[in-house]
């Protein structure tokens, strides 16, 4: 697939099946762990640090799987799923720019939760700003991110780290 600046749900599913960046390279998780419905913009320049950016969206629907179990009679999207979406997006970005290997989250410096996603909400928007990209034997992205719910920033993550590994045997 050619490098584009936006991706549909069906194209994200191709990535989840390993059909986008080639065998053994970056993949997104399959649903229900795929935490966004589309990538609305991805670019290797721009963003807060001029090192690249990616924006994705999740349509919030009351029938999303996590609302039934987190929590019974008090449905809320788990914060860790928003954080995982951010790692997913950094991994996608590394594959999109040509990095080789399987993606693994390597950590995060700081996370702040200032709000919640509830079944009546409409739209989650993730914004990732790459701070540093290493494309050598080590392939790694470091980024800051925000998650908005219906236009209000509710999560912030600084120094998200994702690496691509050609072998995960010793990981």
Curated annotation (Swiss-Prot):
Keywords: Cytoplasm, Fatty acid biosynthesis, Fatty acid metabolism, Isomerase, Lipid biosynthesis, Lipid metabolism, Lyase. Its EC number is 4.2.1.59, 5.3.3.14. Pathway: Lipid metabolism; fatty acid biosynthesis. One of its GO terms (molecular function) is trans-2-decenoyl-acyl-carrier-protein isomerase activity. InterPro entries: FabA (IPR010083), FabA_FabZ (IPR013114), HotDog_dom_sf (IPR029069). One of its GO terms (biological process) is unsaturated fatty acid biosynthetic process. Belongs to the thioester dehydratase family. FabA subfamily. This is 3-hydroxydecanoyl-[acyl-carrier-protein] dehydratase. The gene is fabA.
């Amino acid at each position: 697939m050619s490098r584009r600046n936006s991706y549909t749900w069906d194209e994200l599913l191709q990535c989840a099946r390993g059909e986008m960046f080639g065998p053994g390279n970056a993949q997104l998780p399959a649903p229900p762990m795929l935490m966004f419905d589309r990538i609305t913009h991805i670019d290797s320049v721009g963003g807060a640090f001029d090192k690249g950016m990616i924006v994705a969206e999740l349509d919030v629907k009351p029938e999303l799987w996590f609302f039934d179990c987190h929590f019974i009679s008090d449905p809320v999207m788990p914060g860790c799923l928003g954080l995982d979406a951010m790692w997913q997006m950094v991994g996608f970005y590394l594959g999109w720019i040509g990095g080789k290997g399987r993606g693994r989250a390597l950590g995060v410096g700081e996370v702040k939760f200032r709000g919640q996603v509830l079944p009546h909400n409409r739209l989650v928007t993730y914004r990732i700003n790459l701070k540093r990209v290493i494309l050598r034997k080590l392939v790694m992205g470091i980024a800051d991110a925000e998650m908005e719910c219906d236009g209000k920033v509710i999560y912030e993550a600084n120094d998200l780290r994702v690496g691509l590994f050609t072998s995960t045997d010793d990981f």
